[in-house]
């Protein structure tokens, strides 16, 4: 929605997918760490299988994050540099773990997006086709939503309809574009 409001958006999940394709250093490190059993027949990483491993074992999750987070941070920095070279001095970085990874200081402001837990589970089940148990493990591995909201400069309530969320995004985008973060 921020993109629709004319702001540049960098998607950390997209970068994570890009750095984990065959031939990339993170891919090789992940396969070494977790074994070939996480691969699909075509050689790509089976993200659901890997997710089941790392969200069941905090040690394995830390191992994966030690591989991917530095690469994701480099990808974000590279995209920010490119945007800056194009004269764009404001960007939204979509990254669920900014606060958890200790990278908060790199950003001028943090925007938390939240909705009720049941609603979040339902939406993720519909979007990702995972079981409730799998989704709850992932949610429970992240920072408490209330803590995240308190640690953020802005909060978007995503529990209502799309029009309500869009109105909040539009208002915040206008503030950001005017330099009021």
List each language-model region with its residue ranges.
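Residue-level recognition of specific faces of alpha-helices
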Residues: 1, 18, 53, 60-63, ...
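A conserved segment at the C-terminal end of the G1
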Residues: 1-10
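Short, acidic/turn-prone active-site loops that include or flank metal/cofactor-
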Residues: 14-17, 115-118, 137-140, 162
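Small-molecule kinase domains that catalyze NTP-dependent phosphoryl transfer to phosphate-bearing small molecules
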Residues: 76, 104-106, 122, 126, ...
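ATP-dependent NMP and nucleoside kinases share a basic, alpha-helical "lid"
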Residues: 77-85, 89-126
């Amino acid at each position: 929605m921020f993109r629709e409001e004319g702001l540049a958006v960098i998607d950390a999940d997209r970068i994570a997918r890009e750095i984990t394709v065959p031939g990339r250093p993170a891919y090789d490190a992940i396969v070494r760490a977790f074994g070939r059993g996480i691969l699909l027949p075509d050689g790509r990483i089976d993200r659901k299988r890997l997710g089941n491993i790392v969200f069941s074992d905090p040690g394995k999750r830390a191992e994966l994050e030690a591989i991917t987070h530095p690469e994701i941070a480099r990808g974000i920095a590279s995209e920010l540099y490119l945007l800056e070279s194009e004269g764009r001095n404001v960007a939204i970085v979509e990254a669920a773990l900014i606060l958890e990874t200790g990278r908060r200081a790199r950003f001028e402001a943090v925007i938390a997006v939240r909705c009720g837990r049941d609603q979040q589970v339902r939406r993720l089940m519909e979007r990702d086709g995972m079981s409730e148990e799998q989704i709850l493990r992932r949610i429970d591995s992240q920072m408490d939503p209330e803590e995240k909201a308190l640690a953020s400069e802005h909060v978007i309530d995503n529990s209502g309809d799309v029009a309500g969320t869009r109105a909040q995004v539009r208002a915040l985008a206008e503030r950001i574009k005017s330099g009021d973060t």
